[in-house]
């Protein structure tokens, strides 16, 4: 018996006039999921608590049974782990942009002309040449203009502000301590030095000279944000006795799984958008389940969230239909406890995460099948699970997998 | 106004093919409970939390308003209290079996031929002759081959393993400390000595000589298990200002009530099984309610749980129908707040407790009557209570009894 949490990222929504006052999920044609709903049990779920807007990171941590208020201080550690940086508890990690600054350090392009190549060479210089007292610097490029920075050493703190000014036309923000500790002051100072040194090291780098010659914005400064301390996390397998794996499109979700000690599977062609190679996503999910190497599989597909952020009503609906196609295989598997959910709602009207609960269903043997027959936010609210929380999910799955012990006698 | 929690132990279940995909409760003819559901309010309940499989002990502690994660370390203390051993906070208590060992101390019968008489005489020897340093030994026989052991003294711990090997053909397990404390080492040593001495004291006891002559297995060794420390518990009446009583079939449930400082009522003819004297159970429940001596009554009938453990589909269904007969009198009482529930599900397909929520209903004056008309797991999930927790029950009952104060102004 395998347990699966299948997260359709950001799927939850609100009624949309253009869809006849249906949500994208309600309006989508989803025969596979409807069939599983008909034969399963449904409900709504507050991933963290009612009205709280979860991030994808805090939502997934919660679904894996960790307390996000305890282990989550920022996105950096999970982004870093997601691109295979070997982070350690206590490391301070950041997401970064390669950006373009002019000679006065005014940021003229936060994404450095959406640079697609050469950042590995820039990263090499950063790793070799940045000098920050006794603090070890680990920098790695990610997709496009993105990268991660990890600071390792004694006396560091994550209680500091961001360097990224968020809007062009400004200098990098001076990083400031958020509390009175020496550690916060020291770390803020270190990050400010890092930003300055990045400009000095990158501005005349051959990669950038060539970009300027080609009329492209140079990637001549690095702007850290999303600071967080890498948490002490009890590995998933130690907590539950289940060998776990994560099949996901984005580094953030894979990073969460990595920090939880789970294996991760990369999906060639996955973009995390509605343009993702859905056939490849499909193949890697099904292959992982069928490999029989794992007791527990966390799946995440990201396009519905992206469409929600973009306010793309029909794109979101159509992507949900693509995901339903993936589900056809799972519908016919007998030896799984499948929990299908979103991590949060990303209403196309809000263009960001909201605190609306998400619709969930379970496919498993032995359920108290309810009389809900289609998958939708409002249909699910009438289901036999009523209203649950994200912290309940792994308890419910493990109970249905029959791998839990009685508490008491 | 009297408050009553009526627990039909282990009643919750899952759909069963042999019952036309109904649960035993859904399939049972329950006119009295259906009538109260029609005139009352229904819901589902997670006694501890969703997906957690409660023991009957931890479930009842929760229903009485105690935190099982705080007060529950094992079943022993409640079994001891249930047969009127006067336990004190700090005592270390065990359930025990009288068993049969051969001359090499191999256990050949864990239940000593299901001995029915003479264990009181064996217990007398144990109480008088066992010598365990400065530790006081209190041993008492219970039904059949069962007994309880209480250790009282300084420097004791419940962080030790069991002596019972669980399967015949093995020697008693050497009891081991579960942590590094001196207390755990000392207590493990004490229990190992107790087991050895029990064999020396009982092997040639006249009761056993006679059993051997009659071709019966002798009860010549005592195997403790289910160790727990007797908790400090604020008495029920002090917590709630309600004089409470428990009418139950089994020692475990009465023991929980006793440790909570409640009175208990013994029911002649009660077996805790589906063969119980249901008329006697009925009489003692109704007499206790009508005595007007108590503000709060905890009722437990145990047969549905036993049938669940046995996988006895029709036995479970038929027993629920018997319980419904008991309910006819309660249906017509006006001055009660009656909360009917199971403590946990014991699906006949699982043959053990599961984490499935249990169906509940309340009969009381002034309720927001919902439109559910029959008592069943899936019908209840559509009720006006939605999904509640075991910790909510006494709050709801006391509110409906109108004995609680506003919090604030």
From Swiss-Prot, chains A, B:
Its EC number is 5.4.2.12. It catalyses: (2R)-2-phosphoglycerate = (2R)-3-phosphoglycerate. One of its GO terms (biological process) is glycolytic process. Keywords: Glycolysis, Isomerase. One of its GO terms (molecular function) is phosphoglycerate mutase activity. InterPro entries: Alkaline_phosphatase_core_sf, ApgAM_prokaryotes, Metalloenzyme, Pglycerate_mutase_ApgM. Pathway: Carbohydrate degradation; glycolysis; pyruvate from D-glyceraldehyde 3-phosphate: step 3/5. It comes from the Archaea. Residues 160-179 are annotated as: Disordered. Catalyzes the interconversion of 2-phosphoglycerate and 3-phosphoglycerate. HAMAP family: ApgM_A (MF_01402_A). Belongs to the BPG-independent phosphoglycerate mutase family. A-PGAM subfamily. This is 2,3-bisphosphoglycerate-independent phosphoglycerate mutase. It comes from Methanosphaera stadtmanae (strain ATCC 43021 / DSM 3091 / JCM 11832 / MCB-3).
């Amino acid at each position: 018996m395998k347990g699966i949490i299948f997260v359709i990222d950001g799927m939850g929504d609100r009624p949309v006039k253009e869809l006849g006052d249906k949500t994208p999920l309600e309006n989508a044609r989803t025969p596979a999921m409807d069939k599983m709903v008909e034969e399963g049990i449904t409900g709504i779920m507050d991933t963290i608590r009612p009205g709280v807007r979860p991030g994808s990171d805090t939502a997934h941590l919660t679904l894996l049974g960790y307390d996000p208020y305890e282990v989550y201080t920022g996105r950096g550690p999970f982004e870093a782990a997601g691109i295979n940086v070997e982070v350690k508890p206590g490391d301070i990690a950041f997401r970064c942009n390669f950006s373009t600054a002019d000679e006065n350090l005014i940021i003229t392009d936060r994404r450095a002309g959406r640079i697609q190549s050469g950042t590995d060479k820039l990263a090499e210089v950063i790793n070799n040449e940045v000098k920050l007292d006794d603090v070890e610097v680990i920098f790695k490029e990610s997709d496009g203009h993105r990268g991660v920075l990890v600071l390792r050493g004694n006396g560091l703190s994550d209680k500091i502000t961001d360097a990224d000014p968020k809007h062009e036309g400004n200098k990098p923000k001076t990083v400031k301590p958020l509390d009175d500790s020496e550690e916060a002051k020291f770390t803020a100072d270190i990050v400010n030095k890092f930003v300055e040194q990045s400009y000095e090291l990158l501005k005349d780098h051959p990669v950038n000279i060539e970009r300027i010659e080609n009329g492209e914005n140079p990637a001549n400064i690095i702007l850290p944000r999303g600071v967080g301390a890498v948490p002490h996390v009890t590995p998933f397998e130690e907590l539950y006795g289940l060998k776990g794996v994560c099949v996901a499109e984005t580094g953030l979700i894979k990073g969460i799984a990595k920090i939880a000690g789970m294996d991760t599977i990369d999906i060639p062609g996955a973009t995390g958008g509605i343009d993702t190679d859905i056939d490849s996503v499909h193949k890697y999910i099904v292959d992982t389940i069928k490999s029989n190497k794992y007791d527990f599989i966390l799946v995440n597909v990201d396009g519905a969230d992206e469409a929600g952020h973009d306010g793309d009503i029909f794109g979101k609906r159509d992507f949900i239909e693509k995901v339903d196609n993936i589900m056809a295989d799972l519908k016919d598997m007998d030896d799984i406890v499948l929990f299908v959910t979103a991590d949060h709602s990303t209403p196309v009207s809000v263009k960001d995460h909201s605190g609306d609960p998400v619709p969930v269903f379970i496919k498993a043997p032995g359920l108290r099948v309810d009389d809900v027959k289609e998958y939708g936010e409002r249909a699910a609210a009438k289901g036999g699970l009523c209203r649950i929380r994200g912290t309940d999910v792994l308890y419910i799955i493990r109970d249905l997998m029959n791998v839990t012990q009685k508490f008491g006698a």
